[in-house]
Every structure is written in C-alpha cells, then in structure tokens.
Amino acid sequence: MGPGVTEADVVIVGSALAGLVAGAILTRHGKRVVVLEQTDTVGGRGGAVRRPDGYWIDFGHRDGHDVGDCQLAWHYGADAAREAGVEIALHRIDRPLRLHRFPEGAVLDGTWGPEGFLAAARDFFECPEDGFAELARVVGEFARAGPDEQEAALPETLGTWLPRHVSHPGVRRALLLMATVIFHRHPEEASVGRLMQFFQNPKGDGPFIPDDGEVGGMQGLMEPWARAIRSRGGEIALGWMPVEIVVDGGRVHGAVAVDTTNLVHEVRAPVAICTYPVWEVFDLVDERRFPREFVTAAHELRGHRADLIGWQAGLRRLPTIRATGRTEEHAGWNRLLRGAERAYRGGYQITSLSSRRSAPPGKHLLMLVMARWFRGGSTAGQPWTVARAELDEAIDYLRRFYADLDACIEWSAYQYVAAPQSTSWAWAPIARHQLEVPGIDGLLLAGSTLEARAAVVDVGAYAGLSAARRALAIL
C-alpha cells in the first residue's frame, strides 16, 4: 500500500489479537477490511519476533501496541476461531504449574483454579492445618460469588478486605500468596472482585501454548488470522503508523496513517476498531470528544501498567535437573518465589517443549520474565541495576536447579519490554471500559483494557469477536 486513499467497510487500528480476530471474521462475511500496523509484523505486543538464527522471542515487537503473555486460556478464542473459519494449533499443557521457592530450593507441582489451589493449600500457600477450613470457605465463596457480589467487591483490595473477613493470620497470608502465585508482585493491592472473577472466568481446556507449523511461540496465535484476512481479500498494511481516527459530526469516517516519510494513506470507513489500550486511543481521537468520566477512568487504569524484564537463553539441548538426574521435560509455567517472605520473582518456561518452531531444530528456548507494576508512577521506579540483580539472582537459582545449564546455553540475553506489557490491570480495583463510547458512532474499542469476563490473552479474542459482531450489525 502506498500513499493515497482506500475505501473500506472497516478500518482496524493495530494488528493485536483482537484486530486480527475481527478482521478474519469480517472478511469471511465479505467485508472490505484494512488493518493498519505500524511495525513490520502482525501481532502487536502479543506475538513473537524471529531472530536471524531462528529463535522466536515472545512479547511482541518493540514498537507494537496492546499486551501479551506466553501461555493462554482459550474459551472465547475457540468461539472466534469457529466463527472466522480459522484453525489455531495449540499444545495443551498437562502439568501447568510448578512452584520454586529459592534460595532453599523447594519445588512443588500444582494446577490453576480453586480445586487445584485448595488441594495444594498446605504446601503451595503454607496454610496452617487449623486454618484450612476457613481457607476452603473463602475460596469457595469466591468461586461461587454472583455478578452483584463481584461488582461490589471490585473496588476493594485484599489488603483492606482480609483483616475484616478472615480471622486466621495464616489464612490471610495464604490468600496473599495465592494472588502472588497467580500473578501479582503486590498482592495486597489486588482487587477482591477480580480474584473472584479469576476463579470463575471460562478458560477452556487449557492452558495452552501455540504450536503453529510455520512460526514459533505466541506468533503462532497471530499468523493464522492474518493468513485468513489476506486470503479473503483483506489488506494488512505493515509499516503504516495510525495517526488519527477521523471523527466528525459525532461519528467515525475512517483513519489516517503515515509511512516512515510521513506520507499519508487515508482509509475511509464508517467503522473503526481500535486495538490499543484505552488511554492510547487519545493519541488518535482527542480526549475532549469523550465523556469526562470515561477519560478519568482511562487515565486511572493507565496507572496500573507494568513493564517486563527478563532473560532469554537459546539452548543446545535440554538441561538436566540436578536433584533427579533427569532431562527437563516440564512444559508448564515455573513460578519463582524468593525468601521467607515468598516475594514474587516472576517465572520461566521452556517454550520449545510445546512450540516446535520457537527454536531451530534440535535446540530449545528458555525464557525467564518478571513483571514490574508502575503503581501510579511514570515508571516502575526500579533502576536497571536493581532489576538486573533480581534477574541474576533467579538465573543463579536456575544454575543450582539444573546441573548443566551453562553447558547447554548457546546464547543468552536480558530482555526489557517497555510498558504496557502483560495484562497487569486485570487485577486493578476499578471498572474498565465498554466496547462503545456514547457520542462517537462507529468507534469500537477492542483492546485488552476492555471489561470482559475473560482470561488474559483470551480477552483479546473476546474483544475481537465482540467488535466483529457489532461491526456487522452497524454495517
């Protein structure tokens, strides 16, 4: 696509999962679709990027938008794939969770969800024997809470809720550990309502890691939709940076994008689907066009961003577990907790045990990552020297856990993914936005900041499916 004008039914801003899902569904219905993507690959921050040596590095393109993860639940995604006529190759993780406490070296296996967590309550969350009944009661109440209870509990954090509702200090600690293991560096700040939703959101028969036959890692979740869009006559304009969603007279008229020389291509369309986090929409549509309370909520949600630091290692072969003498075969997630306080230190996985294209033939890829919440600041507030020291401490633990890690490493490098990355706001004690905004007809906000009873990553599929259905109704 060069400078000029294109007429379309729908313009999609960003090729994150939601945009690709929506585009595949809409083109199947014969709609004219143009996807504007400023980078040179699809997937935004949710896919993977290939190194020249054939390794696929998750968490997307440096200049992409939206967020991602390295595993996924897949409920709404399965519905979307059926509606789009797209096949997604997924590898189910049979042993989804392994917990490491370091430096002492305790290693425990477990599963996600209320039943799995209660089964491991004593070992995983160190719940005292005389507190187990109370823990079971609280988790059961969370898992059964109705929509009204969830909504009422949404603005309350565990830090304020636990002292009033849980009598046993060991149970309070166990519930905070539970939130840490699920995914929160600061569990006392997690929303009680969101924890209820975690136990109830449909997740499909997962977790999964994509296992595409052509591309590796999370890019395997992105490319099948893109192939469908292109094969049905849709256009994915790579290298074109959206600079404006055109709104005039209270309705959408399309979008404007520029190439690297700032020359313009205008896509004229009555519907625009934006896949960016909600506060980034204001770079494309003046925030004064939105209701004041909408803008306030969007900026508040922005304060719950996180970035991601990590370490990636290409392996010549799989390492050997020191304690057993066996070659590593755990394909699930490894959560790392440090010290007696069980502080969050991220986790790791060997992606190549599930994704056949994530590493060159015969080789493997290990990724270790830690999310850092901004907590209302403009950055995580942690200098790189401290962050690197935390990573090095975790890497040193891996050298103790594995007998021969250094001998397996072909290359390694630190990773630093600027915010926003990871669905850190999934735990925020505030309501998120809806698909449509009063007063702007034809604008559909389908990023991962959408309010939805959906798991991380799967929320993108939900957003894309919802946006496609609404666009079809508008058209």
Regions from the language model: what does each represent?
Residues 2-127:
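N-terminal glycine-rich phosphate/pyrophosphate-binding loop and immediately adjacent elements
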Residues 31-33, 272, 411:
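Hydrophobic anchor at the start of a short beta-strand
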Residues 61, 450-472:
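A conserved FAD-binding loop/helix module that cradles the flavin
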Residues 96, 100-197:
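Rossmann-like flavin
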Residues 178-182, 395-453:
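A glycine-rich dinucleotide-binding beta-alpha-beta segment and adjacent secondary-structure elements
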Residues 200-264:
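Helical element adjacent to the flavin cofactor pocket in flavoenzyme catalytic cores
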Residues 241-361:
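Mid-domain catalytic core of redox enzymes
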Residues 311-417:
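C-terminal segments that line or cap access tunnels to active or ligand-binding sites in enzymes
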